[in-house]
């Protein structure tokens, strides 16, 4: 849990903004969304495998585009 200390003469808005930024860096919102509903282990594996395939396809596309001459 991110903790911030409110500095002297710091407005509430600035402190709230710093807290939100620290929560975002810690990945709290993503974690809450991921744990909101139960996800079966097979579904998790399937989603991760699809993500891996997408990453590889994107990398291959970039490598091929880099080697292709446009003239």
Swiss-Prot record:
Pfam families: Ribosomal_S21 (PF01165). The keyword Methyltransferase does not apply. GO terms for cellular component: ribonucleoprotein complex; ribosome. GO terms for biological process: translation. Residues 48-71 are annotated as: Disordered. Residues 48-59 have a biased composition (Basic residues). Keywords: Ribonucleoprotein, Ribosomal protein. Residues 60-71 have a biased composition (Basic and acidic residues). One of its GO terms (molecular function) is structural constituent of ribosome. InterPro entries: Ribosomal_bS21, Ribosomal_bS21_CS, Ribosomal_bS21_sf. Coiled coil: none annotated. Belongs to the bacterial ribosomal protein bS21 family. HAMAP family: Ribosomal_bS21. This is Small ribosomal subunit protein bS21.
């Amino acid at each position: 849990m991110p903790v911030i200390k409110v500095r002297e003469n710091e407005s509430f808005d600035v402190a709230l903004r710093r807290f939100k930024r620290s929560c975002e860096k810690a990945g709290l919102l993503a974690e809450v969304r991921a744990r909101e509903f139960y996800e079966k282990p097979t579904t998790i594996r399937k989603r991760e495998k699809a993500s891996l395939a997408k990453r590889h396809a994107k990398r291959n596309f970039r490598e091929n585009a880099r080697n292709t001459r446009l003239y």
